[in-house]
Amino acid sequence: MEKKISPNLTLFALAINAFAIGSTEFISVGLLPMIVKSFHISLSQAGLTVSLYALGVTIGAPLLTILTGKWNRRSLMLGIMLLFISGNLIAAFAPTFIILLVGRILSALAHGIFMSVSTVIAADVVPPSRRASAIAIMFTGLTVATVTGVPLGTFIGQQTAWHMSFLFIASIVLVGLIASYFLVPKNLPIPGKVDLKGITRIFTNKPLVFSFLITAFGYGGTFAAYTYLSPLLENLGFSANAVVIILVVYGVMVAIGNTVGGHWANKKPLDSLVKMFSLLILSLVFLFITVLMDNSLLGLLASLMLGLFAFMNVPGLQLYVVELAEKYVPEDITLASAFNIAAFNIGITVGSMTGGVVTDHLSVTYTPIFGGFIVLIAVLFVLYIRKQEEQKNNYL
């Protein structure tokens, strides 16, 4: 008989893994200038380390969730972390830029399925009344990664070489792997095979399809600018060390924004999204103007404002999809959530690639304003859906 493991210890192991995952996703943002110099490539090419990673998560979340439905959850978690370590080691020792991208994509595939599996494990190890809190504890690893992991990884890369940043993350994942081996129970429920008909049910449901589009454009617009935040700040005259400190404060602003956004989205997520997207657009426009003016003080303020509003919409976007899934496809809530994770990362891909194109054809200075245009598309989708709902309610 397996010795009972404290749920808090299991959640601690998941939080360590989430910290490593969160650090890896955005570590390239701080390392872009170093990667450009190391491989003698353009800034937009270096941006592929962000956009292709997001594409890997997009594929990994739904596809691997479907393929591994019958696997033991603990064994799957250990396999995910081994894949994640492999991807970071390949990136760390990459002799060419192509090999670096291969390492990033492998890590991204692990990231995609981790988000689905870890949420289920967190919910399974606690009583039903504590499930939301358990998932929140696990996700604190991602928040802490934004505040400390990315800046620390960037600092390590600046003081040594960018390769060491990926070794740093691989070492954290190794700790998470060991913790998972001892602290994740062996006898967790196995969800079973995913009903592929659920895909049809989800993508023939108009509100859900529009919710994915809102997620992709509303979340993704930020990344046209955020992907290139380090060179933007350096263009404003900030040193490499100053950029690290700014990224730490940026992460704190993200954490505050997430908390505020969660409170705003509790009652009417759709209405709150219009407000949060509008604030995000204003912050992107402000950043564009300050960079154009070459004003370092206002540019710093605009960057921190972007941190506050950039990810404020995440709780609302997640809640809106869950509410729609509960209403229209209650048997496919897990799959709908996986597709929303994919939508988040499609947004990152679209945003970061747009930033790359803008950087190549105009200048990195113009990335924030194009990000604002992408978010504006999400606002139009929200207004359309809200109008549809009002008309439907009037007929009832």
PLM regions: where:
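Helix-to-loop junctions at the C-terminal end of transmembrane segments
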Residues: 61-72, 258-269, 359
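Conserved MFS/SLC helix-loop-helix module at the cytosolic interface between two early adjacent transmembrane helices
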Residues: 59-98
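C-terminal membrane-cytosol helix-exit motif in multi-pass small-molecule transporters
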Residues: 170-189, 382-385
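C-terminal transmembrane helical hairpin of 12-TM major facilitator-type secondary transporters
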Residues: 271-317
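Paired small-residue
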Residues: 83-90, 95-107, 297-305
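Helix-breaking motifs and short loop linkers at transmembrane-helix boundaries and internal kinks
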Residues: 40, 72, 93-99, 110, ...
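A late C-terminal transmembrane helix in Major Facilitator Superfamily
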Residues: 324-362
